[in-house]
């Protein structure tokens, strides 16, 4: 039997590192308090004064001793847990991230550095060995520099492509010292195929795992030895990608950033609610506030969109038998707040089945330059012009004096969150 690994000339071979700042937010807070990150019992909690406040990060000790982790709620933290709660300081985390990224960039050029999230980055060091040594030597130098300058422990996954580097990071490097691991094509049977669950695999979610289970694929070995034609038939190009990923093959190139076409570029905001929202009016209010924020961003960039989408995440996903829903509609190109609110509310009511809501998002796609005003068949030109002027006036006031200087009436209703969230960085206090 031939396999995708049989012809090495067809395999992408680079020296890629996936670097993670271990429990980044919690580590920053530990260092602020003069505690070693591995010795601290700290949880960074958003909205700590609310029972529904979310844990954004927990120190390794906290995870191990109390099983506190990402998305643990405030009400789940018992009094007997000796956990120090810290308010997120996003502006400080961003500054630290910038400084740490500068260290990564000392070992490669910017084209081969790809920030994946605030605490995780990829770098390709294929052409850096003459200057800095082997993969392991480069990883060790990075770890030492970051720890010496910031006190942060970094873990490093090394692979011949981004997938292998990421899998090495998540499944081995993060678990024990020296916080490094290397996964290669020749180790696929002893690494990738030994992963216990499909949905633990990077790029396969729980829904896709269930669909794979339904056709007799229960682990990565099964996926690697499945009928590729069947995978393509069931999942399209995603099926092809999953098949190759199960063999450790990933053709991603860090130097080739995905630059979306203008019709695919979008603007959106999302929010995790601090409690279950069950009343339709309260959900409408939050949708309206988010739509207002998205419309403001569109106008700031002097663009408009013609596809509006809404995402709703349920609090009781198991009871509802699904995690929520998404819906979208095409409209005349617009960046008007009223248009986005009207569409968002319509889409919400078109699919909502009464289940409690915890996540809300609004997004606008198919973007074009806002060069002209689109006239409505249902409103007079005078009213259209007045609405445009109102939006522009609100934008100017907020630009000068901040978001809270002028808010729409619904932001004073029960369930509204925009006023409380105004001034936050990344949804949290700076």
Tell where the protein language model's regions lie, with residue ranges:
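Acidic, metal-coordinating catalytic segment for phosphate/diphosphate chemistry
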Residues: 324-430
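Residues that scaffold, gate, or flank divalent-cation-dependent active/transport sites
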Residues: 1-118, 122
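Long, highly charged, low-complexity intrinsically disordered interaction regions
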Residues: 136-197
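DNA-contacting surface of Y-family translesion DNA polymerases
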Residues: 5, 9-11, 18, 208-356
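Catalytic palm subdomain of template-directed nucleic-acid polymerases
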Residues: 123-143, 216
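Short acidic, glycine/serine/threonine-rich loops at helix termini
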Residues: 28-31, 54-59, 164-172, 236, ...
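Short Gly/Ser/Thr- and Asp/Glu-enriched loop/turn motifs at secondary-structure junctions
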Residues: 116-120, 158-162, 303-307, 356-359
């Amino acid at each position: 039997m031939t396999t995708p690994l049989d012809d090495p000339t067809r395999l992408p071979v680079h020296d890629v590192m996936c670097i993670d700042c271990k429990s980044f937010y919690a580590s920053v807070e530990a260092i602020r308090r003069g505690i070693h990150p591995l010795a601290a019992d700290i949880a960074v909690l958003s909205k700590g004064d609310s029972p529904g406040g979310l844990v954004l990060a927990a120190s390794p000790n906290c995870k191990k001793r109390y099983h506190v982790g990402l998305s643990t709620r405030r009400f789940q933290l018992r009094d007997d847990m000796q956990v120090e709660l810290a308010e997120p300081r996003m502006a400080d985390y961003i500054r630290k991230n910038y400084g740490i990224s500068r260290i990564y960039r000392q070992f490669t050029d910017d084209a081969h550095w790809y920030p994946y999230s605030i605490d995780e980055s990829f770098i390709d060091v294929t052409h850096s060995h003459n200057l800095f040594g082997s993969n392991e030597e480069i990883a060790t130098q990075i770890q030492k520099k970051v720890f010496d300058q910031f006190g942060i422990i970094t873990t490093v996954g090394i692979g011949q492509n981004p997938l292998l580097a990421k899998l090495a990071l998540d499944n081995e490097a993060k678990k024990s010292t020296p916080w490094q691991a290397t996964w290669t094509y020749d180790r696929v049977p002893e690494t990738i195929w030994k992963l216990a669950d499909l949905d633990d695999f990077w790029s396969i979610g729980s829904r896709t795992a269930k669909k794979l289970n339904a056709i007799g694929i229960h682990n990565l070995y099964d996926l690697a030895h499945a009928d590729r034609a069947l995978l393509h038939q069931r999942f399209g190009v995603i099926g092809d990608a999953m098949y190759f990923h199960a063999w450790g093959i990933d053709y991603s190139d860090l130097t080739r950033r995905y630059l979306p076409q203008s019709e695919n570029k979008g603007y959106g905001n999302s929010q995790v609610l601090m409690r279950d929202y069950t009343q339709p009016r309260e959900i409408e209010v939050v949708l309206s506030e988010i739509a207002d924020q998205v419309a403001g961003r569109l106008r700031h960039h002097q663009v408009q969109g013609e596809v509006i989408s809404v995402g709703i995440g349920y609090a009781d996903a198991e009871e509802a038998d699904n995690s929520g829903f998404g819906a979208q509609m095409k409209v005349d190109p617009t960046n008007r707040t009223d248009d986005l609110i009207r569409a968002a509310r319509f889409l919400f009511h078109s699919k909502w089945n009464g289940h409690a809501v915890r996540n809300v998002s609004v997004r606008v796609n198919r973007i074009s330059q806002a060069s002209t005003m689109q006239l409505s068949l249902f409103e007079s030109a005078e009213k259209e012009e007045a609405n445009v002027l109102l939006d522009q006036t609100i934008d100017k006031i907020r630009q000068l004096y901040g978001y809270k200087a002028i808010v729409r009436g619904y932001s004073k209703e029960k369930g509204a969150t925009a006023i409380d969230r105004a001034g936050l960085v990344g949804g949290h206090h700076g």
